[in-house]
């Protein structure tokens, strides 16, 4: 629950390395933090629900770190039990999987320009109640989903297309 900043005076060696506390933010135990661009997203349980926070370096001050609560406006949206956070900078999103809603994939879409967030939204994809999303991950513009359903387990993929028009 403590984030460290590693520094060194001169060449990095075992004698010159220094670790200083950079910040302190509570985080969940089950989902590994996930980096997209200059941000790292992580989960933090809050009551019966989970916050997803974005850890970042404050503009032009690389030693100062902070975290935004991306779910601050939807406090009761993602149930506890987050076990996976994945995403891609190609399409600017993260996906979150939770044991509290195995049949859903929560999606956080965002757009930054010149270090300023222009847009952000939370949504979810809901699969049949009996289904379980076991994993989801992205490579470029394609999301891969491992979904367990009554007929077995499938590896599925969805393509996101940047600059698509309706």
Question: What residue spans do the PLM features occupy?
Answer:
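Beta-sheet-dominated scaffold domains
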Residues: 2-166
């Amino acid at each position: 629950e403590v984030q460290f900043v590693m520094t060194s005076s001169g060449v990095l060696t075992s004698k010159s390395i220094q670790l200083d506390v950079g910040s302190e933010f509570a985080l969940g135990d089950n989902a590994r933090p996930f980096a997209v661009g200059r941000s790292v997203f992580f989960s933090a349980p809050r009551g019966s629900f989970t916050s997803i926070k974005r850890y970042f370096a404050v503009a032009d001050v690389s030693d100062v770190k902070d975290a935004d609560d991306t779910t601050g406006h939807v406090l009761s949206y993602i149930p506890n039990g987050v076990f996976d956070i994945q995403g891609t900078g190609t399409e600017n999103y993260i996906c979150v999987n939770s044991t509290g809603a195995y049949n859903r994939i929560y999606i956080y879409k965002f757009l930054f320009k010149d270090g300023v967030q222009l847009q952000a939204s939370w949504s979810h994809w809901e699969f049949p109640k009996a289904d379980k999303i076991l994993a989801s991950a992205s490579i470029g513009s394609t999301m891969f989903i491992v979904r367990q359903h009554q007929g077995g387990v499938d590896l599925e993929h969805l393509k996101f297309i940047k600059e698509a028009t309706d």
